[in-house]
Design a protein with these regions (language model features):
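Catalytic-domain carbohydrate-binding cleft regions of carbohydrate-active enzymes
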Residues: 1-275
Length: 275
């Protein structure tokens, strides 16, 4: 069953009755598809006929990815100890991923390496890539008030707004964070250029974190219904990032490492099932 509904959907899976799956939405209309296979492979083929086909990720993406994850205090020496430790143990490594602390804390996101621990990011990336590694860095679509990008975003009108015209902000992840409005073409271009600079530096792909905690009372540049945009936002977010990667790396090399998704999100591979 493909529930083609961008708003909140309630699924009851064998709860009210163990032999049934129920789904419902507020209101009077619901669009859904019953997709026959009969095999699951055929179901997926037909589902992607409706919602879009993913491209085949590059061969290197099928190798082992090593992440700093929630390592909160690390520098190039620490990174090399992780990488060399894998090589010393004869464990092949394809990608090294820098999670959130490649940027200075409380500046997420500003897309700027924390110079306190990474004074020579371009040199570091070259040294890591000389070991045969691809490089991934963590990003999201939130901009904290301490970020150097916050003022740019406010002045350019690149963030979601409140009904009174103020920037929509909250403190859930970073103090006073704002959310990039991907219905605004100028905001998409601004965000894309920040990512292009990282790719020019030697980054190969991005972990597109978050994208699911999107308010339903915000005002969008194009007037979109914020309730319907709650799920669709992540599609636009990952589309923008994937298009940057296609532009700079080519379609056969473009890959991201996405957390949130909605119907059609598979067109921007890949997603992980962790969070």
């Amino acid at each position: 069953v493909f529930v083609n509904h961008p708003e909140r959907v309630s699924f009851e899976v064998a709860t009210e009755m163990v032999t049934k799956v129920e789904f419902s939405v507020p209101g009077e209309n619901l669009d859904y598809f019953l997709i026959n296979g009969p095999t699951m492979k055929e179901v997926l083929m037909r589902y992607t006929d409706i919602t879009g086909k993913p491209s085949l990720p590059a061969p290197w993406t099928f190798g082992l990815w090593l992440s700093t994850s929630f390592t909160t205090n690390y520098d190039e020496k620490t990174v090399n100890s992780f990488v060399d430790g894998m090589f010393d143990r004869k464990i092949p490594l394809s990608v090294f991923h820098f999670d959130c602390f490649w940027m200075k804390d409380f500046n997420w996101c500003d897309f700027t390496w924390d110079s306190r621990v990474f004074p020579d990011p371009e040199g570091m990336l070259k040294r890591l890539k000389a070991k045969g590694l691809k490089i991934c860095v963590w990003i999201n679509s939130y901009v904290g008030q301490e970020s150097s990008m916050f003022k740019e975003g406010v002045e350019g009108g690149y963030f979601l707004k409140r009904p009174n015209g103020d920037v929509w902000q909250w403190d859930m992840w970073q103090p006073g964070l704002a959310i990039v409005d991907f219905t605004n073409p100028a905001a998409c271009e601004w965000y894309s250029k920040k990512l292009e600079a990282l790719l020019d530096m030697g980054v190969d792909c991005f972990k597109t974190d978050f994208g699911e905690r999107i308010p339903t009372d915000a005002v969008y540049y194009d007037g979109s219904d914020p309730v319907k945009m709650h799920n669709y936002y992540t599609y636009l977010y990952n589309k923008v990032v994937f298009n940057v990667l296609k532009k700079k790396k080519g379609e056969k090399e473009a890959v991201l490492f996405a957390r949130s998704a909605t119907a059609g999100g598979q067109k921007f591979p890949v997603h992980w099932g962790g969070d």
